[in-house]
Amino acid sequence: MLKTVNLGLQYGSRKLFDKVNIQFDKGNCYGIIGANGAGKSTFLKLLSGEIESTEGEVIKDPKERMSVLRQNQNAFDDQTVIKTVLLGHKRLVEIMNEKEVYYAKESLTDEEGMRLSDLEGEFMELNGWEAESDAATLLNGLGVSDEYHYELMGSLDAKIKIKVLLAQALFGNPDILLLDEPTNNLDYKSTRWLENFLLNFDNTVLIVSHDRHFLNNVCTHICDVDYGKIKLYVGNYEFWYESSQLLLQQQKDQNKKAEQKAKELQEFIARFSANKSKARQATSRKKLLDKLVLTDIEPSSRKYPFIGFKQAREVGNDILIVDNLTKKGLFENLSFTVRKGDKIDFLAENSMIITTLFNILLGKEEADSGSYKWGITTSVSYLMQDNKEFFSDERLDLINWLRQFSPDDQTESFIRGWLGRMLFSGEESMKKSTVLSGGEKVRCILAKMMLESGNVLIMEDPTNHLDLESITALNEGMTSFKGNILFSSHDAELLETVANRIISFEGNGIKDKMTTYEEYLDSLKD
């Protein structure tokens, strides 16, 4: 059991949390959601004791073990991969180390013998004899193969380290599990394995994630962090979204009816209050007016940008022909044709394959051999992860930054309107383009793409850095777009709802199927 009592956190004059009372029970998986900056990760740090609250308290059974997904990738560089996973259970490692000390001695005193016996008993209770085997099972499930298990962490690349730290958090059947963005940098196989692990996990789990598909599959409850309060909903992310939108609409409709009724009553009172024959009715209407109450709709920090892509001209039948394209070390003799209406998701375990392919198609990089040809009616807009080329001029504020990509002779109010649609209002539109966060840069690029009105979109991991609200808006924009899209993503919900064709790089070739993402995953099981 884990709960908070009147929990509060204040930085200067800003209250991040105010009198939060919530309880997390065994057997449930809680998704922590909220706008960027709402305090989701900070809340997990309060629960884990990494930071202290300014008021109230966190209550946890001292007998229960809490495990936290760490983000410190370099903290275990001098440890082997297996040992790093075992370090997820500190007490178990302490016992192992103390046992080694006693077994290294030639003889033991009676007291030391008793101590060793106690350690062996506790070691067995903690399933210590299977510890390395259990650690290996977790690693293999997350895609870290046997060849890495006894390598030093310092010799591994960042993506493998992240998986090892996730295995560390999962190790040893913790009573309470706190996971902050656990699916970041996981491929779809590792993500599906993690989903199955959590679905079969019997203890308490709290997760911060921007992956809607993941939250839908594993969560039994949703904790909505908004303006210092946390509201608890029963159900997964999709149920929360639909029910919260329905409740908000019902409140608005109820208020609209109340306002209309109030207007009618006021008009009657104004017309007949001086009329003796109608005075009693006017007084009655006034009493009704006094009883009318408008529902107080609480303000929310959750804001959805407007994202909608329109084509300046409809594309013809010839979109793109790729013929025997080769880039050594990445792909060879790659050939495919893009047809009108295709929304193609590109999948590859090595993300550099897709990045390089997109750069070649955009003319930013040369292929070693082969060719590609765009149709004469195509106009391409793009969003790539490396977007430094657009944000290097320190002189440009957001108004003048977006003006570069706007139709000629557009007014400042036109530019401000577009920025407002992407949640840059008031003084925010005067920000220098070089100081933007990752998510702000992506929203700016999306505004640029909308203004360009291309009929072909190339998008590399477009949901990276975005909050759930922006991801939802982007998903709707890509789904409703009438042109062609070539994209890559780790967001399963986006893949499932947007893609109608999958091109996956496998071995030395590709698999090209007209299929949905879910059907593609099902085909892998056959």
Regions found by a protein language model. Give the residues of each.
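Amphipathic heptad-repeat alpha-helical coiled-coil/stalk segments that mediate oligomerization
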Residues: 297-321
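ABC ATP-binding cassette signature C-motif
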Residues: 1-253, 312-526
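Intracellular alpha-helical coupling/juxtamembrane segments of multi-pass membrane proteins
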Residues: 240-268, 272-296
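Short low-complexity stretches enriched in small and charged residues
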Residues: 22-26, 179, 277-280, 300-303
